[in-house]
Amino acid sequence: MKNVREFIWPLIGLLAVIVSGWLLYRELRGMSLDDVWDSLTAVPSHRYALAALSTLFAYAALAWYDRIALLHLGVRHISWLFVSVTSFTTYALSHNIGASVFSGAVVRYRAYTSKGLSAPQIAVLVALCSFTFGLGTILLGGVVLVADPTLLHRLEELLPSMLTNPATARIVGLLLLGFVALYVVGSVLHLPPLVIRKAKLEYPRPAIMVRQLIAAPLELLGAAGIIYFVLPSHLEPSFIVVLAVFLASFSAALVSHAPGGLGVFELVFLTAMPDIPKADVLAALIIFRLFYLLIPFALSLVVVLLFERARLAQAWRGRMVADGSVPPPPLSSSDQ
């Protein structure tokens, strides 16, 4: 059964790419590459700079996820720089590969074992980082739906009419915020672990929980900011609209298991932004993929190669010393 699951999820991801690609083709037919290029070149340079700063902000927040998990484990000897580079590499790879839990676990295992962490500790770290991200999505989703439940009307082509109803949307938002409130209560009152099937949620101590609530939304705010800043300034909707559409698009991309959410993310975003020219929206999404996914992915490959080269060189030197191939240092006069 496990082998079947390992085969079926990549197949679902591939199917999601094909279906969303076909739907995107229908959505974008008639648009020329010149239209998209004109939209890309129309973005002012200072807007590109703001998008780049939003990218740095988002990845800094992701590094805080790792730091919070290490504090939960009582690990304080690892430097912020090492944590930041590890987190950056982890998410840059997993965002593009698609299997975020698997690829994140592999990268973190290679990095954190070099700092003395055990496999069970790294498993807890990976789980807590994933939960922190989910907590941020739930928290922001609840806030957005309660603040403006009419936002789901933008997805009426993709969702049942019952869900896009403002009253239903507000109830969903309140339920999401209720989940966050229960998590806070569980942490403050030191409740026993919450068990759902095989998953067990250990409530962290309040100091960790508060950090999670602060850090969890920041990455999503930064990522949504990339798109917000490069949309046409005379047409751009409010930030809460961009954030709501981003949350829906990003969540759909994750659920689809498509590598990097390819096609799925764009389809949902374009559908939910009918009031902005499609070429301008597509240009903003291209910039998002470049800043948030492709450039970090290229840099992460360099980091992995340098790290593995250093580990290999260290292992080789250790083997040479063990085999006696490296002569001992000469004796000093005091030793003779």
Q: What residues fall within each predicted segment?
A:
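Internal, well-ordered alpha-helical segments in soluble enzyme and binding-protein domains
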Residues: R108, S118, V124-F131, I138, ...
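Membrane-embedded alpha-helical segments of transport systems
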Residues: T89-I97, T113, S118-G141, A252, ...
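Transmembrane alpha-helix interface/packing and boundary motifs in multi-pass membrane proteins
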Residues: T89-G98, V245-E266
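Predominantly cytoplasmic-facing regulatory/coupling regions of multi-pass membrane proteins
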Residues: M1-F88, V146-L254, I276-I287, F291-Q336
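Transmembrane helix boundary and interhelical loop/hinge segments in multi-pass membrane proteins
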Residues: S100-R108, V264-F265
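Interfacial segments of multi-pass membrane proteins
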Residues: A111-Q121, A244-V245, E266-A283
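Membrane-interface segments at transmembrane-helix boundaries
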Residues: L73-S84, V107-A127, R197
